[in-house]
């Protein structure tokens, strides 16, 4: 189980987007794409075969390394560490993620 998954709310702790809070759009190996974070300008050449591609300069999100983001705890409104523990329900134990500062569970059971 990974510490950061798609849909998690994270805060950027290093880089040009430091302090930005956003949702993780996708996870790529050891990098994450954060909504509205680490914006780059991409130059697109016009393509006559695709009418929707008119070309120009487009702003889009670039991946950030996992070490440059941390989970954002909405209760404490700060970056937080994530731990793992096993919870038992109906005789079946399940591994869940939780915030270490206040023991609040991140995953749904």
Swiss-Prot record:
GO biological process per UniProt: translation
Annotated TM spans: none
What Gene Ontology terms describe where this protein resides (cellular component)? Answer: ribonucleoprotein complex; ribosome
Taxonomically, the superkingdom here is Bacteria
A Gene Ontology molecular-function term?
rRNA binding
Q: Could you tell me which Gene3D superfamilies the record lists for this protein?
A: 2.30.30.30
Disulfide-bond pairs as recorded: none
On whether Isomerase is a keyword of this UniProt record, the answer is no
Keyword Flavoprotein on this protein? no
SMART domains per record: KOW (SM00739)
Alphabetic keyword roster: Ribonucleoprotein, Ribosomal protein, RNA-binding, rRNA-binding
State the InterPro entries in the record. Answer: KOW, Rib_uL2_dom2, Ribosomal_uL24, Ribosomal_uL24_CS, Ribosomal_uL24_KOW, Translation_prot_SH3-like_sf
State what this protein does.
Answer: One of two assembly initiator proteins, it binds directly to the 5'-end of the 23S rRNA, where it nucleates assembly of the 50S subunit.
Q: How does it assemble?
A: Part of the 50S ribosomal subunit.
NCBIfam families reported in the protein's UniProt record: rplX_bact (TIGR01079)
> What family name appears in the similarity comment?
Belongs to the universal ribosomal protein uL24 family.
What is the name listed in the Swiss-Prot or TrEMBL entry for this protein? Large ribosomal subunit protein uL24
Task: Please name the source species.
Answer: Legionella pneumophila subsp. pneumophila (strain Philadelphia 1 / ATCC 33152 / DSM 7513)
Name the encoding gene, please: rplX
């Amino acid at each position: 189980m990974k510490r950061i998954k798609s849909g998690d709310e994270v805060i950027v702790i290093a880089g040009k987007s430091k302090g930005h809070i956003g949702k993780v759009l996708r996870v790529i190996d050891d990098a994450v794409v954060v909504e509205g974070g680490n914006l780059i300008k991409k130059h697109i050449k016009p393509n006559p075969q695709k009418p929707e591609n008119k070309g120009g300069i487009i702003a889009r999100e670039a991946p950030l390394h996992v070490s440059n983001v941390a989970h954002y705890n909405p209760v404490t409104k700060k970056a937080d560490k994530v731990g793992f523990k096993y919870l038992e329900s109906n005789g079946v134990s399940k591994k869940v993620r939780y915030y270490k500062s206040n023991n609040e569970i991140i995953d749904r059971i």
